[in-house]
Amino acid sequence: GSMQLINDERSAEIYDVVKSLSPSMVSGGSASNTINGLANLGINTGMVGMIGENELGNFFLQDMKNSGVEPHFFTSQSRTGSCISLIRPDSERTLATCLGAAIELTADNINEELFDGYDYFYVEGYLVQNAELIETALRIAHEKGLKTCLDLASYNVVEDNLDFLKTLIRKYVDVVFANEEEATAFTGKEDIEALNEIGELADIVIIKLGCKGSIVKWGESIT
């Protein structure tokens, strides 16, 4: 599966088709899921984002607070971003994403104070849709001495933004996360060869292998 960006109208059309399947509503997104997981381990976490002043926005805000995540959220008159996730029995998923208010977060919203008190900065590759925003955030985090982490998000995101992603990683990123498809899209290679090539740009590289675990390169060490 992959991720496709859609508008409000298309999102409503898809929801009309799938609502008979009794879908559930949960907070999600690559960064949100990661931060939630860390918060559940008792780690001090925060999240920066833009939400709408609507039911979805309130749900997301309260869910983050309930999980122990400190929200650094800006608000918009637009609808809160949402994603319809279609999951097959083999766990492959297709994501129909309407960015909504999320895409209105800009580089002007990012300041040094947002990073105070944190040691790591994690950003999802989907944010390359706003090149100025992702580069500004990574640059400031890097300059303030945080360890910066980037998840490549989806193979089609990698294919469409390959040169820009390589530049970002080379200049600002310490840790790269990718699954097998994303690593191959990034390098044209597989497994250890892909791991080593990405490792030329970042200090730590993690390639996720689903039920088989992960392979990790840290300096010269591979596990």
Stretches found by the model and what they are:
Residues 1-46:
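Glycine-rich phosphate/adenosyl-contacting loop at the front of the ribokinase-like
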Residues 7, 15, 19, 45-71:
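A glycine-rich beta-to-alpha transition motif near the start of alpha/beta enzyme domains, typified by
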Residues 1-3, 23-26, 50, 61-76, ...:
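Ribokinase/PfkB-type carbohydrate-kinase core domain
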Residues 44, 81-83:
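Conserved beta-strand residues within beta-sheet cores
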